[in-house]
Amino acid sequence: MAQQRITSDIFAQLLTLSHLESSECAVGLATQIEDIIQYFSVVEQFDPGPRDDPDTDNAQGRCSQGNKIDVDCCPDWVRKDVALPGLSVHDLKRLSTEFADGYFRAPRALDGSA
């Protein structure tokens, strides 16, 4: 992957989109963004290759159209959102002795009185 640099135009656009003004603090943002972009180039080197998933009929990581599997292309590749039963109240009560009125009791940490 070619080395990408944050130009002053791109940085100005990022500041505008972020509703920030160009100040000394915001200028440090350009370096951070460049670091993030460089990190993604490092991560891209570790492509896992074809998927080997016995639960699918397509273990090559490609959908029927030959595209890489993604949610937009092949929504059937990702698992379905199915509500499964959770813990019963009886099981929850076994997790903690601090249980009252159907809820876990916790110290008042938000107002500093804990």
Curated annotation (Swiss-Prot):
Annotated coiled-coil segments of the chain: none
Reactions catalysed according to its record: L-glutamyl-tRNA(Gln) + L-glutamine + ATP + H2O = L-glutaminyl-tRNA(Gln) + L-glutamate + ADP + phosphate + H(+); L-aspartyl-tRNA(Asn) + L-glutamine + ATP + H2O = L-asparaginyl-tRNA(Asn) + L-glutamate + ADP + phosphate + 2 H(+)
GO biological process, one term: translation
Provenance organism: Treponema pallidum (strain Nichols)
Function comment: Allows the formation of correctly charged Asn-tRNA(Asn) or Gln-tRNA(Gln) through the transamidation of misacylated Asp-tRNA(Asn) or Glu-tRNA(Gln) in organisms which lack either or both of asparaginyl-tRNA or glutaminyl-tRNA synthetases. The reaction takes place in the presence of glutamine and ATP through an activated phospho-Asp-tRNA(Asn) or phospho-Glu-tRNA(Gln).
Covalent S-S links between cysteines: none
Oligomer status and interactors: Heterotrimer of A, B and C subunits.
GO molecular function: asparaginyl-tRNA synthase (glutamine-hydrolyzing) activity; ATP binding; glutaminyl-tRNA synthase (glutamine-hydrolyzing) activity
Family: Belongs to the GatC family.
Location of region: Disordered: 46-65
UniProt name for this protein: Glutamyl-tRNA(Gln) amidotransferase subunit C
Superkingdom of the source species: Bacteria
Keywords per UniProt: ATP-binding, Ligase, Nucleotide-binding, Protein biosynthesis
Documented EC number(s): 6.3.5.-
